A protein has these predicted regions:
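Positively charged n-region of N-terminal signal peptides that target proteins for export
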Residues: 1-4, 8
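A short, solvent-exposed beta-edge/loop patch
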Residues: 98-99, 135-176
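A short acidic-to-branched-hydrophobic micro-motif
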Residues: 102-113
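Short, conserved charged micro-motifs
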Residues: 114-122, 160-164
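Surface-exposed, low-hydrophobicity interaction/linker segments
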Residues: 38-97, 117, 121
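C-terminal motif of bacterial Sec signal peptides marking the signal peptidase cleavage site
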Residues: 15-19
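Bacterial signal peptide processing site
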Residues: 21-24
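An anionic, turn-rich surface loop/hairpin at beta-sheet edges
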Residues: 121-142
Length: 176
């Protein structure tokens, strides 16, 4: 618990170093579908997407603990995925900047068997806070669906990156 709190405080401190700037939020959804179970862990898939569509910042991939149902654990799930709980997902991971205050977050979740994948994607898109970094805001928010995996990407387009390029890389990883 103390490690989690220290990590969250360190992340908040890192994100607070940049000046506050305002952007308008224009979320969109670009769903794709497949009927097969996606192979690989969420961390592996995130890393493959970044290999195809490299970023110019030091980023890292972290699994999201879905078993922690404490207040802090549920906050972490909501903060990263936009979902209120892990009822419809079995695995999740996030890729983001390790230092600095950048509006960038890419999350992948594996949906539970029988879960409505499109509903999970919509819940992520509508539940995520594009201003979660306080001083910066994502102006591009997209989700993509492939089989039992949902990817959520949000970023500030002023960074020179586009959410669509990450959706395209996700589709390449999936062979679509």
């Amino acid at each position: 618990m103390k490690k989690f709190a220290a990590m969250m405080l360190a992340l908040a401190m890192l994100f607070s170093f940049a000046a506050c700037g305002g952007k308008t939020n224009a979320p969109t959804t670009a769903p794709t579908e497949a009927t097969v179970k996606v192979e690989g862990t969420m961390e592996e898939l995130l890393n493959k997407v970044v290999e195809i569509n490299p970023v110019e910042f030091m980023g890292g991939t972290m699994p999201i603990d879905l078993t922690d149902t404490s207040e802090d654990g549920l906050w972490n799930i909501k903060y990263n995925t936009g979902l209120d709980n892990a009822d419809n997902i079995t695995e999740a991971a996030v890729f983001g900047p390790m230092m600095g205050s950048m509006a960038f977050s890419m999350v992948m979740v594996r949906t539970a068997e029988g879960a409505d994948v499109k509903a999970v994607a919509e819940g992520m898109k509508t539940g995520i806070d594009p201003r979660k970094w306080i001083c910066v805001e994502a102006d591009e928010v997209m989700t993509a669906v492939s089989g039992d995996v949902v990817m959520l990407i949000m970023l500030d387009s002023a960074s020179g990156l586009t959410a669509q390029s990450f959706v395209d890389a996700f589709n390449t990883v999936r062979g679509q």
